Amino acid sequence: MKTLSVIPLSDSSRWDQTVHSFCDYDVYYLSGYVKAFQLHGDGDPILFYYEGEDLRGINVVMKRDIAKDPRFIGKLPENQYFDFATPYGYGGWLLEGPGDRKPLFTAYERWCQDNGVVSEFVRFHPVTANQEAIYDVYDVIGLGGTIALDLSSPETVWANLSSKNRNMIRKAQKNVIHIYNGRFPAIYEQFQEIY
């Protein structure tokens, strides 16, 4: 059976249980994360969950009333036209399984049309590369690279640094540069004096 369901933020336990059932989920999909942005005024969080034959998917969005945008106040009726945006960070559909994606996106498009959603802006996750599975559904535009560093071991980190950065680190070590991590009042006082 193929179903597209909407999980509201008010059902946060079901929301998080659904998200945790996916291998590549990230904090950006969890209810507590999106609730903070709802409180900030970024829209109403919705989690879409699709389950079909050999395919499952989730998508978290912030639903915003376009009539409340300063450019449209007084020009559009409220609660009629909406847009979706990824919560701050990354999002987009996370898909698992080799099944046919067409029924998912047909159901999703129908839901959006039936509920007045006229656009969606997605910041896809650069590590999970979830946009790869849906180039034929979304207009995906690259906006620059993301820098990532494999932190699996100190040796791997060192090997992946550029020679210029390794030389700068050696120079700092030679000059006995100290790096502190923590909240020590004495460090803050020294910083203020230097600054």
Where are these regions (language model features)?
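Acyltransferase donor/substrate-recognition loop-hinge adjacent to the catalytic core
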Residues: M1-S10, A133-Y195
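Conserved donor-binding loop and adjoining core beta-sheet/short helix segment
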Residues: L4, S10, Q17-H20, V34-R110
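Helix-loop element at the rim of GNAT/NAT acetyltransferase active sites that forms part
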Residues: T18-Y28, I194-Y195
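Structured helix-beta-strand junction loops
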Residues: S21, D114-N115, K174-V176
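A short, aromatic/hydrophobic, helix- or strand-capping loop or linear motif
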Residues: C23-K35, R123-F124
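A structural signal for short, well-ordered beta-strand segments and their strand-loop junctions
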Residues: Y49, G57-V60, V118-F124, Y180-G182
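Short, solvent-exposed loop/turn segments at secondary-structure junctions
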Residues: R64-I66, P126-A129, P154
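Non-catalytic accessory segments adjacent to catalytic cores
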Residues: G99-L143
